[in-house]
Amino acid sequence: MSSTTKPWAIISGAGPSGLLLGLLLAKKGIPIQLVDMSYELDKQPRATHYGPPAMYELRRAGVADEMREQGFFPNGVSWRKIDGTFLAGINVELTSDDPDRMTCLPLNKLGKILYEHISREPTATVSWGHKVVGLGQDDDKAWVDVETPQGPKKLEAEYIIGCDGANSQIRRSLFGDFEFPGKTWDEQIVATNTYYDFSPYNWEDSNFIIHPEHYYMAAKIGTDGLYRITYGEKPGLTLEQLKERQPMKFKEFLPGHPDPSQYKIVNFSPYKIHQRLAPSMRVGRFCLAADAAHLCNPFGGMGLTGGIVDVGGLYDCLAGIYEGLADPSILDKYAEIRAQKYNEIVNPISSDNIVRLNGQDPDKALENDEFLRMCKRAETDHEFAKQMQGGVNALKHDFTQYYKKKGTQNGSTENGDFLKQHHLPLQAAAAGGVNA
């Protein structure tokens, strides 16, 4: 996009959600500008697992093949006791013919792929070092006030989208710094990226360990032996105390009870976890998507998959408006339905995912936990297993049905009733993407 062309949409946040939305819009020929306060792409791996609804959107953007070249297909998921005893699992190989099969790739690598693609789009501009400090709108336009290396600027567009993460300045400016309804969990979580040899133990690529104190997740996130090991800790500890306790924790719960000489930690990130939803995902010409709009605990990767599905739905709405196929009121549908998906699917199921690990007796888990019993059934009933895994599509929604003319049916709720009926965790969640 030339320096004199006014963008039709401005996207705040050049992380993966903002880059994906920008790429989808730019591929339609829509002039867009991304602004980000950073001066480069985020280099942290963060989340890693993309469920089928997310891969559908990434395939629409034309990046799925490159993701799979650089990443891999996880082979399955298990729930275990702390001694490694297998309780139940999900065989994702049953859906190996799905064009949107779950894929694992660190988020920073996806960001690089998306940035390379959007850089080739003539209607897209990415402006680094642009910090949003204020915003406004009237009947004709919306704007953001930004601090830039060249001084303060006022940037205008028809629509402005906040894809600027959990600490979203767009959301804060719309609703106030502390207006993000929901809760913060008492649990202290520590996410690590660790090289450790799990091969002697014949575990799946993603594993959840049920224990009241030493619950954790171990998920393969690379083809070079790198695992995301994320575990629960005592609340109230300092960073130094958490680091001091880490060798004890690993020796206590990892298979083989290793000493520090037997593994290599390359990233150590303690954080608190939240369940929160913005008061609205639309205010006039402003919209929110992904972490800027809602948060959930990371056990299950539902924040990543759900956020990408937000972006795909918002793209269909904005593209419909731009092409004259939809009225601006379609954005009210976006805000309503994406909030509904959070409240009915993402929030309760992601909450169940962590309570399943630390809120029950592992010796009675198969007896008391309906989901684990269903996983056991699915081990021998493959048709039932496919229905379970297909339930993930309940996250999707076809916003083109609200076009004035018949849309392209970009979205599906296939098997969604099954998911709601059985209150199932998404298989994307089961793979254990973690935002560290």
PLM regions: where:
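Conserved FAD-binding catalytic core of PHBH/FMO-like flavoproteins
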Residues: 116, 134, 139-143, 147-153, ...
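Glycine-rich FAD pyrophosphate-binding loop
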Residues: 26-47
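Beta1/beta-strand and adjacent pyrophosphate-binding region of the FAD-binding site
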Residues: 2-17
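Conserved mid-domain beta->alpha element of the FAD-binding
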Residues: 14-23, 27-31, 58, 114, ...
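C-terminal helical "tail/cap" subdomain of flavin- and related membrane-associated enzymes
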Residues: 5, 317-436
